[in-house]
A protein has these predicted regions:
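Acidic-enriched and Gly/Ser
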Residues: 1-160
Length: 160
């Protein structure tokens, strides 16, 4: 089973990542489907696109956009799957929705580790708009930006 232009993926565990184990107990963090923070972003590739070659292979663990597995309520209050749902817990994913595979950035994505805020008078956990490159890509490496490089970025350009 192959899609022409999309990957087919399935959730690594479940489509929502809202349970944490603390000792021998399980803590449910969220019971609703609305909050994007509790949607799983980890998936396993089941099929690669037939139209082109890619570095991502079947069986690779990928990090994807949070709306792929998301469920939502329509105007009548009926729960619906995302538009990427295919069947039997399988989803279509465009190449741009895959951010990382096997801990390597996909396409031109990079990942930045935030710096902790040491200013005791500020109520922020992390320093705004500054970080250290954790995972880079070929384009950035050609510019001399490698893992460990301290960088700044514009406000509201980051994704958590």
């Amino acid at each position: 089973m192959n899609s022409l232009y999309s990957f087919i993926v399935k959730p690594l565990n479940k489509r929502y990542d809202n349970i944490r184990k603390i000792g021998d107990k399980k803590l449910i963090l969220n019971t609703g489907i609305e909050d994007h923070q509790f949607i799983s972003k980890k998936a396993i590739v089941v099929s690669t696109p037939a139209a082109f070659k890619t570095k991502v292979n079947v069986g690779d663990e990928v990090y994807i956009h949070h709306n792929v597995f998301r469920r939502w309520y329509d105007q009548k209050g009926k729960e619906r799957n995302s538009s990427t749902y295919f069947k039997d817990d399988l989803y279509f994913v465009s190449p741009e929705q895959i951010y990382m595979y096997n801990l390597k950035p996909h396409l031109d994505y990079c990942f930045v580790k935030p710096l902790l805020n040491n200013h005791f008078l500020e109520n922020r956990k992390e320093q705004p708009n500054v970080g250290v490159v954790k995972y880079t890509n070929n384009t950035l490496e050609a510019l001399g930006i490698t893992p460990g490089t301290l960088i700044t970025f514009t406000p509201n350009s980051e994704f958590e």
